[in-house]
Amino acid sequence: MTIRNQRLSLLKQPISSILNQHLIDYPTPSNLSYWWGFGSLAGICLVIQIVTGVFLAMHYTPHVDLAFNSVEHIMRDVEGGWLLRYMHANGASMFFIVVYLHIFRGLYYASYSSPREFVWCLGVVIFLLMIVTAFIGYVLPWGQMSFWGATVITSLASAIPVVGDTIVTWLWGGFSVDNATLNRFFSLHYLLPFILVGASLLHLAALHQYGSNNPLGVHSEMDKIAFYPYFYVKDLVGWVAFAIFFSIWIFYAPNVLGHPDNYIPANPMSTPPHIVPEWYFLPIYAILRSIPDKVGGVAAIALVFICLLALPFFKSMYVRSSSFRPIYQGIFWLLLADCLLLGWIGCQPVEAPFVTIGQISSLVFFLFFAITPILGRVGRGIPNSYTDETDHT
């Protein structure tokens, strides 16, 4: 048997054929830009987080009296421990940067539209799982911001009618954030990344069922090429750029994206003057704080994800790509600026004028989802020459 025949025989095996179908011979639109490379970057970030997390867990002790010291032990005594911790801590930030860019690319090019509704909804579920995983991971170092962040955020569950207080008690494992809480969060933080892997594989499988969107938003079965080697090489450029960007944070600014109060051991008797979550939670945190009522704030956070989940089902879009929708382009860039403003508001004190700015910014955020179905009706349709080949329902 020749080498070529051996290769073909190997690719016909069950597992190999699946990998070949989805990672090598997958038919890809030939006009994809670098904005379509953030999906593979997100996968790389997830692998980095799992690998570094497994090694960190070998030296971490989930106990309120030992957790903070075990983190310092990793930093000071474990060979390469400082690198593992900085890769894991900054890797979370890189993961969210990549995913946020991935989401905004999907919004700009309307990648959520038919027939990719399920792909988008799975992506929203993955995003929600990421938020939960990152939050409980932020608690594990058991510094001041870890402890008080856990206390404030978990207590929000008490806003749920009837069962809220029961849920909070279950989350805490008692009547306050304590050792039981830390143990539960450590177990969940170890488990959830593997659930994320499963959800990501479902996301990929759902995407490949109908194929990738493209910058023009026009579906064509003819103008496609194999994923390998063309888009591997194109993605490689993004991977190298990401590695350089990631390395700068690890080696030159490893603590810039964190909070200095988390280098102080948790003290239940001393409340920090300003409780701030990690930067990637700040836009959502700003929406939460903009509403004085606890129930209203929790409802607003739930509404954020409901809006994202409902977006694909507004079947009112003649043209997918924003390249041909100048009005939507302007609204999109307004949304992006608004999210950046919400991020800045989230780290400011709860006082005037920041509260008012946060309320206005939150209103603008939700108005985007309210007017998107209307904007879908504004503009010219797809040319008749593409009607037979294009799905623009």
UniProtKB/Swiss-Prot annotation:
UniProt cross-references to Gene3D superfamilies, sorted A to Z: Cytochrome Bc1 Complex, Chain C (1.20.810.10)
Which terms are listed as keywords in the entry? Electron transport, Heme, Iron, Membrane, Metal-binding, Mitochondrion, Mitochondrion inner membrane, Respiratory chain, Transmembrane, Transmembrane helix, Transport, Ubiquinone
Post-translational modification here is noted as: First mitochondrial-encoded protein to be shown to have its N-terminal methionine cleaved off.
Q: Which cofactor does it need?
A: heme b
The superkingdom of the source organism is Eukaryota
Primary site of residence: mitochondrion
Q: How does it sit in the membrane?
A: Multi-pass membrane protein
Instruction: Paste the cofactor note.
Output: Binds 2 heme b groups non-covalently.
Transmembrane spans = 38-58, 82-104, 119-139, 185-205, 231-251, 295-315, 327-347, 354-373
Question: What start and end residues bound the annotated signal peptide?
Answer: none
List residues binding a ubiquinone: H208
Question: Which chain positions lie within coiled-coil regions?
Answer: none
Compartment list: Mitochondrion inner membrane
**Pfam families found in the cross-reference section:** Cytochrom_B_C, Cytochrome_B
Residues binding heme b b562, per UniProt: H88, H189
Alphabetical list of InterPro entries matching this protein: Cyt_b/b6_C, Cyt_b/b6_C_sf, Cyt_b/b6_N, Cytb/b6-like_sf, Cytochrome_b, Cytochrome_b_C_euk/bac, Cytochrome_b_N_euk/bac, Di-haem_cyt_TM
Q: Which SUPFAM superfamilies match?
A: a domain/subunit of cytochrome bc1 complex (Ubiquinol-cytochrome c reductase), Transmembrane di-heme cytochromes
The molecular function terms of the Gene Ontology recorded here are: metal ion binding; ubiquinol-cytochrome-c reductase activity
Single GO biological process annotation from the record: mitochondrial electron transport, ubiquinol to cytochrome c
Q: Where does heme b b566 bind?
A: H102, H203
> Would you identify the family this protein belongs to, as annotated?
Belongs to the cytochrome b family.
Q: How does it assemble?
A: The main subunits of complex b-c1 are: cytochrome b, cytochrome c1 and the Rieske protein.
One further remark on this entry is: Heme 1 (or BL or b562) is low-potential and absorbs at about 562 nm, and heme 2 (or BH or b566) is high-potential and absorbs at about 566 nm.
Purpose: Component of the ubiquinol-cytochrome c reductase complex (complex III or cytochrome b-c1 complex) that is part of the mitochondrial respiratory chain. The b-c1 complex mediates electron transfer from ubiquinol to cytochrome c. Contributes to the generation of a proton gradient across the mitochondrial membrane that is then used for ATP synthesis.
Q: What is this protein called?
A: Cytochrome b
Organism (species): Solanum tuberosum
Q: What is this protein's gene name? A: MT-CYB
